[in-house]
Amino acid sequence: EIVTGLVGSEMCIRDRAISRNRYWGSCIPVWINVDDPEDMLCIGSVEELENLSGKKITDLHRHYLDDLDIEINGKTYKRTSEVLDCWFESGAMPYGQQHYPFENEDNFFDGFPADFIAEGLDQTRGWFYTLTVLAVALFDSVAFKNCITTGMILAEDGRKMSKSLKNYPDPEELLNSYGGDSLRAYLINSPVVRGEPLKFSEEGVQLVTRNIILPLWNSYSFFSTYANADDISFKDLEKASPVQDRTMMDRWIISSMQSLVKTVNEKMENYYLYEVIPPLMNFVDELTNWYVRSNRKRFWKEKDENDIDKINAFKTLHEVLLEFSKCMAPVLPFI
């Protein structure tokens, strides 16, 4: 919808001016014959400008270049007074950051086109557009292979967030109350990651904390509390049975964890970030409300060197918590 709608209509509009009548900005490198406005010189490098002007160039801003004339065969050329539109410069970002084509040619093509870019929906007429126009003009190529476009975050009442209206929660208080992971998971699971508007709700962040963060923390706390109480060490966990020899519940939760890893990888690789949280929540429910609750007696019973079942339970929970942390690190990096 974004490609055929917003971007598609943008590609059909009339040509844009790339010049601005401002003082600050990148000078347009065009010198015009004072007697013939159709006779122009487009300068391609500092070195070329130095050769044509016969002067050492130490500054590329207007206050220096506007007074720099070029004399060729009795003709005088003065720089056009405009500067480049900032959006033109934004679109030139891939080339500017590598100082291409003057150097780093190998490094440039190693990262061009970019694997992905991410910006708000408004950039369909800004950065996305100018990146595409310049890449096509220069290389007949796209500038990026994948794009994540976010929608606008509105206040809960549907209006624009406004300091004067005070219609949104304080971000610092939000982070202090619920943590960064809750906020990240809430936003990733919202319409905003699909390029649609989001009416921000603090209650939504609370629900993520209640349904994901706290249950996970409780599972970790359960593991660490009873492992420390029974002096369960990593050396003890190494004695655990192979997965195929553990209980059906152990094998089930490990299988569920592996399914989650597979699903998350597929969604992430295809940039379907908004489809990551539902399977995550389902797994957290399976882990906390089914596996841990159904196996509490295995963790609580007395430690016995001849009883491998207790070690298997701790080993399974440890494996699952560790793999979950690694799998969900892009979404929940702080937990």
Q: Language-model segments: which ranges?
A:
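Generic structural microfeature
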Residues: 6-7, 67, 124, 153, ...
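Ser/Thr-centric signal marking residues that sit
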Residues: 4, 86, 316
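Alpha-helical recognition segments enriched in aromatics with Gly/Pro capping
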Residues: 22-24, 32, 43-197
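Active-site His/acidic residue clusters
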Residues: 36-40
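Single conserved hydrophobic/aromatic residue that forms the stacking wall/gate
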Residues: 1-8, 13
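Helix-rich, typically C-terminal accessory recognition domains appended to large enzymatic cores
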Residues: 10, 14-35, 129, 140-144, ...
